[in-house]
A protein has these predicted regions:
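Short, acidic Ser/Thr/Gly-rich low-complexity loop/linker segments typical of extracellular
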Residues: 19-24, 29-49, 126, 195-207
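A short, solvent-exposed loop/turn motif at the edges and junctions
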Residues: 44-76, 161, 215-236
Length: 242
């Protein structure tokens, strides 16, 4: 009997609307080879029986930028959130705020770097307990508005040198469950900002779109908080160093 193991479960959403993208609309490659993950309703893709080690999943879809994620297969089941960013031909229905961000390292384009962008003002979600210690996976959170307005997925805890990316797995009755334990301690009132992962191209640039003028926090896993960018409605061009 053939045993089937879910090595990775990917939740794919439209990074602009937050709505799920169904697997039938996506073209997928795994480690450079075309593949057909098992597609489940609600924007889920399931990768089965992966060999142990590092893998790279790349997704393409009409109207979106190519997106990719690297992950480690270790015998368990990895949970991955993938946001597809609007690209050429995306059907915007209102005025938008665009950002073209150039990232430099030692005065040269920083190609192939992974950054997280986290806009403020979409909704208010913050830590509601006196202190959350490193290693905790369950947090008491305050959401200004209905809890269902806070989507599951990646968030930036904006906390100076202790800033970090966390994954919100569930949120009910003021209790949020994370996908992995906290790496740092955080005190009451620290904001959780919805975050999306971006990659710079060969020219060190990335493109992002937001619904309205906002302030965007820029974070890199290896460097922490890099910048806080105030964006105006329309076109914005910024350059930051790593």
């Amino acid at each position: 009997m053939i045993s089937m193991h879910a090595s990775a479960v990917c939740r794919v959403v439209d990074g602009y609307t937050g709505k799920p993208l169904e697997g039938s609309a996506l073209s997928c490659t795994l480690d450079g080879v075309f593949c057909r993950p098992v597609a489940k309703q609600g924007g889920y893709l399931v990768l089965l029986n992966l060999s142990p080690g590092r893998h790279r999943l790349a997704l393409c879809c009409r109207g979106y930028q190519e997106e990719w994620v690297e992950f480690q297969a270790d015998g368990g089941t990895r949970e991955l959130d993938i946001t597809m960013k609007p690209g050429a031909g995306y059907p915007f229905r209102q005025t938008i705020t665009r950002l073209e961000l150039t990232v430099e390292a030692a005065g040269h384009p920083a190609a192939g770097r992974q950054l997280w962008l986290a806009p403020s003002g979409l909704f208010e979600l913050k830590l509601a307990q006196t202190k959350a210690e490193a290693g905790e996976e369950q947090l008491r959170l305050y959401c200004k508005g209905p809890e269902e307005t806070a989507p599951m997925g990646a968030y930036l805890i904006a906390d100076g040198t202790n800033s970090e990316i966390v994954g919100l797995r569930s949120f009910e009755r003021e209790m949020g469950m994370l996908t992995t334990p906290l790496r740092h301690a955080h005190s009451r009132g620290k904001l959780l900002l919805p975050a999306q992962r971006y990659h710079t191209g060969p020219d060190g640039k990335l493109a992002a779109v937001f619904r309205a003028a906002c302030t965007v926090e820029v974070y890199a896993e290896e460097a922490g908080l890099l910048a806080s960018l105030k964006l105006e409605e329309g076109e914005n061009r910024q350059t930051i160093p790593l």
